[in-house]
Amino acid sequence: KVYMIWNEKKLTESSEQFFSGLEKLDNKDFEKSAEIFLNSSLDQKDGYRVLSIFGLAHSNFENGKISEMVSNYQTIYEDKTIGNYYQDLARILSVMKDNKSNFSELQGRLKPILNSPSKLQLLAAELQIVLFIRFNKLDKARNSIKILLARADITQEQKNRLSLIDKVYNSHAK
């Protein structure tokens, strides 16, 4: 019974610490939120660990610490004890927010999602198109758009986005 009380108290403290970090994020106190999330993420047994690493990554992004942000996301996607969905989400966020890495590095982070039956595969494929455009690989972007538009499993919203991108870049190519 003493262990259960101690364990419940520990969980309450962890949740309060995590939500305090979220509050600091909301108030744009990114240095303080990073400090809180770092402390939360170091507790390996805590249920808030993964969420705290995501919070730390976002705090580092807001502080302009892109290398640290990438490292935080890498901690998530390389940890085999963390679920695939969260690993894939960390990969996608690291690519979306990273304005320093080169094309090969960014595409390398997306490859595991693109080559697996992930729930986030279509989103990663769209993000790859954005990378092609960002790095001026417009032929690859147009080809990827064609391939994605031919898939039966894309949503109407995705079709609309891809069609719009295709129209914009095809009109500039003429």
Predicted regions and their residues:
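Soluble extracytoplasmic domains of inner/organellar membrane proteins
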Residues: 60-63, 70-72, 76-174
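Short helix-capping and inter-helix turn/linker motifs at the boundaries of alpha-helical repeat units
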Residues: 11-12, 47, 119
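Short extracytoplasmic/periplasmic juxtamembrane "stem" segments immediately C-terminal to an N-terminal membrane anchor
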Residues: 11-32
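Non-membrane alpha-helical segments in proteins
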Residues: 18-22, 51-62, 89-94
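Extracytoplasmic/periplasmic/luminal assembly and interaction segments
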Residues: 28-81
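N-proximal accessory regions
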Residues: 16-19, 41, 121
